């Protein structure tokens, strides 16, 4: 009788025996490398003379400054608004409206701009043209170099009018006046991109796929690993069908690593960083499309515009006129003229 019960028990255990794994070691897989959101490239560097390329290095990477314009809505929007306000009063001169807007935008974005004097065969100045500041470099003899494929374009000091914003640490290149707000612009953009990727990825920031079902065969495990490794990029956690006969419903789990819904500072980051950007540009919030958070509002936008025009726009317009019109080689018909005597604006 005992032998019969022993055989019955052994047979029952054999029926319940789980699938054994040939490889019992722990498995860890990666679902893709971390993707960088933004690279700063905007740290201030000491300039030095590059003898190989025969020009001074730049204090801040200009490609990073150019990319930042399109990465952040507040920063880029304010730059375009500042450019438009300067160009709105342009009357006439050796620059077309489009050329003036390009030169002003480069001056605001990179901190300097070079206006080339276009000469005829007799050496007379017959036109003016802004040079792209993104590719502008300066040599020891103060000549201006414009990088391009092949040999660079070189303009002697007397062939350009070089306007630059003051930098107390060096006097070779100009420095944008919004430098103090760069990190706020980066933070604002990174917060938005992080939120977009969070929802693209299934409302989680990644996690651990944990399996503890003894009925999960090695073949099924390999198929799961293969499917996960083949899914890359944003939203790499897609629907996956797994069939484990007599499996445990809790045998496969996805454990999120982080959850931003518990303490979401997205709104605070966006609001504070946006205010920092406007402060760096000294630009009125009422002109930037900022929605007021209090019942008092942002004041009269016409008064804000008049004050901003008086303190920021007109001084820049006068500087451009003085730099170009005071050059003895530039004839009077090429002198630039801004209508800065607009009494209706209330700026003067």
Tell me what each language-model feature is:
Residues 2-12, 151-298, 303, 307-348:
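Extended, charged amphipathic alpha-helical segments
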Residues 23-52, 138-146, 189-210, 241-243, ...:
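Short, charged N-terminal helix-start/capping segments
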């Amino acid at each position: 009788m005992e032998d019969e019960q022993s055989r019955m028990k052994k047979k029952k255990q054999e029926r319940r025996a789980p699938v054994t794994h040939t490889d019992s070691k722990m498995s860890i897989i990666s679902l893709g490398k971390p993707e960088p959101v933004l690279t700063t490239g905007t740290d201030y560097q000491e300039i030095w003379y590059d003898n190989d390329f025969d020009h001074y290095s730049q204090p801040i990477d200009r490609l990073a400054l150019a990319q930042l314009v399109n990465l952040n809505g507040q920063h880029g929007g304010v730059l375009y608004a500042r450019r438009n306000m300067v160009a709105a009063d342009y009357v006439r001169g050796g620059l077309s409206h489009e050329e003036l807007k390009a030169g002003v935008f480069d001056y605001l974005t990179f901190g300097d701009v070079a206006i080339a004097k276009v000469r005829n065969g007799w050496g007379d100045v017959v036109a003016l043209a802004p040079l792209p500041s993104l590719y502008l470099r300066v040599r020891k003899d103060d000549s201006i170099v414009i990088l391009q494929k092949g040999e660079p374009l070189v303009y002697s000091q007397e062939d350009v009018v070089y306007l630059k914003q003051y930098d107390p640490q060096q006097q070779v290149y100009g420095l944008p006046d919004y430098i103090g707000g760069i990190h706020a612009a980066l933070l604002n953009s990174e917060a938005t991109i992080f939120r977009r990727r969070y929802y693209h990825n299934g409302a989680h920031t990644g996690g651990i796929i944990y399996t503890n079902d003894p009925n999960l065969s090695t073949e099924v495990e390999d198929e799961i690993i293969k499917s996960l490794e083949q899914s890359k990029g944003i939203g790499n956690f897609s629907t996956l069908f797994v069939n484990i006969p007599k499996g445990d419903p809790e045998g496969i789990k996805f454990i999120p690593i982080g959850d931003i819904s518990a303490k979401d500072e997205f709104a605070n980051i966006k609001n504070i960083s946006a205010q920092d950007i406007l402060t760096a540009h000294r630009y009125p919030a009422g002109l930037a499309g900022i929605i007021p958070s209090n019942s008092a509002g942002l004041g009269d936008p016409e008064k804000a515009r008049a004050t901003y025009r008086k303190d920021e726009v007109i001084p820049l317009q006068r500087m451009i006129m003085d730099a170009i019109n005071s050059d003895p080689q530039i004839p009077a018909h090429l002198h630039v003229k801004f209508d800065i005597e607009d009494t209706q604006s209330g700026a003067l």
